[in-house]
Amino acid sequence: MTVETPMKDPCYWDRELFPHTPLRALAPDLWVVQGSFPAARLPRNMVVYRSAQQALLLHSVVALAEPEMRELEALGEPAVMVIPHWDHWAHIAAFKKRYPRIDVVCPRASIDQVSKHIEVEYSCEDYFPRHGVKYHQPPGIRPLEGVLEVPVGAGKVALLMNDLITNVPHQPGFYGLVLRLTRSSGKPRVIYFVRRQLRVQRQPLRAYIAALAQRRDIEIVTTSHGECLLTDVANTLSRVAQDL
């Protein structure tokens, strides 16, 4: 595909680049890449989903070096940029500049904050039902973020989560100590900092995650921080619910 690079600022993309992993396939139409940011304490994942129309949905974008961007563009045309929470604004302006026709989508409750960085064209709550994609609003949290449900073949689905479940290993240094002391690292869980920001009500959220654990069609759960849930997903979700 042709990328429209504004001549006024040909280096705009280079300024967005920080270390990242290669694109990794999770399923035939689902990929993840992990990027790091100097101002962020935890790496962040971008999840890429390809629809039946060969259009790409980019969830929590991460700017990639040109070889990886060409690899991404070879998968399909970037058509939807999901900003899953107002705090995930890094790189969004650069992606809109690179792909002027991309749809900019975020949760309704995050629009005011995201709009400080880029114009939001659609809310998740309106956009995805119109396009045949399920968008969950988990009970017991502020609606600043939600969960996307996408098909991955053979009657199975993937859940694209944001910060709701974090799965980071123990980290070094003082911040790593804080994570360990607050039981926020080492295994998949709803961590302390997320519980505070989303004002989690434990009982309804626990019931929601426990209900997900009962489903047998959930093959993958992606996260914005740490490793995605790829094996023993039902039991892992059950443990997350019990731990909450």
Which role does the model predict for each range below?
Residues 2-63, 119-183, 204-217:
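Catalytic core of the metallo-beta-lactamase
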Residues 57, 63-106:
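Active-site metal-binding motif and surrounding structural segment of the metallo-beta-lactamase
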Residues 65-66, 87-91, 111-114, 166-169, ...:
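Active-site environment of divalent metal-dependent phosphoester hydrolases
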Residues 78, 217-223:
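Proline-aspartate-enriched helix->loop->beta-strand connector
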Residues 87, 106-113, 122-126:
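Short, polar loop motifs at secondary-structure junctions
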Residues 95-96, 111-118, 129:
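Short loop/helix-cap segments at secondary-structure boundaries that form the rim of catalytic
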Residues 185-199:
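Short glycine/proline- and acidic residue-enriched helix-loop micro-motifs
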Residues 225, 231-244:
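Binuclear metal-ion centers of metallo-dependent hydrolases, dominated by the metallo-beta-lactamase
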